[in-house]
Regions:
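The feature encodes the CheY-like receiver
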Residues: 70
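Two-component/phosphorelay signaling modules centered on CheY-like receiver
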Residues: 10-35, 41
């Protein structure tokens, strides 16, 4: 999993780095909103130069944003990223009260995920790795190794799961 994280607290950035390295994920971190956007736009441009325009390749599997970061805050960063790439997976990781954060991100008009700080390591990694989605797909008899090899994006996995749920509801 390749993750871009915008976090102003140096100790927290270090924690993310250790955590993601431990689970063999790739982390690129930014200390503020401007740096995050610069990294995101650079990576998006590099991908566009290397791939066919019809392919929907994401520069990052997830972008994790602290709600309050210097310069442009997490909400502004999310708005700009989603404006250029509406399929990008965004996760807000914040110590803010969940209700306040949910109200703020509602204005994005896009599905974003929230994780409350402090979070436990397993919860965060499972969220990044779509562990719960894979568990549910396996209940439908799907071969999880085949699905992982196909390297579906988070959005595609959720769409597959949604279709399977709807098919299960239909009368035979």
């Amino acid at each position: 999993v390749k993750v871009l994280i915008a976090e102003d607290n140096e100790d927290t950035r270090f924690y993310y780095d250790l955590l993601l390295q431990k689970h063999r994920h790739i982390l690129i971190s930014a200390k503020d909103g401007e740096e995050c956007l610069r990294i995101y736009h650079d990576e998006l441009e590099n991908i566009r130069l290397r791939t066919d325009a019809t392919q929907k390749i994401q520069p990052f599997d997830a972008v994790v944003l602290d709600y309050k970061i210097p310069g442009r805050d997490g909400l502004e960063v999310a708005k700009e990223i989603l404006a250029v790439n509406p399929h990008q997976r965004i996760i807000f990781a914040s110590a803010y009260v969940r209700d306040i954060l949910m109200e703020a991100v509602r204005h994005l008009k896009q599905l974003v995920e929230l994780v409350q700080k402090p979070f436990n390591e397993r919860q965060f990694i499972e969220m990044l790795e779509d562990t719960e989605v894979y568990r549910e797909l396996s209940k439908f008899g799907m071969d999880i190794n085949d699905i992982k090899q196909a390297q579906f994006r988070h959005e595609q996995l959720n769409n597959l799961l949604k279709v399977l749920r709807e098919l299960r509801k239909r009368p035979k």
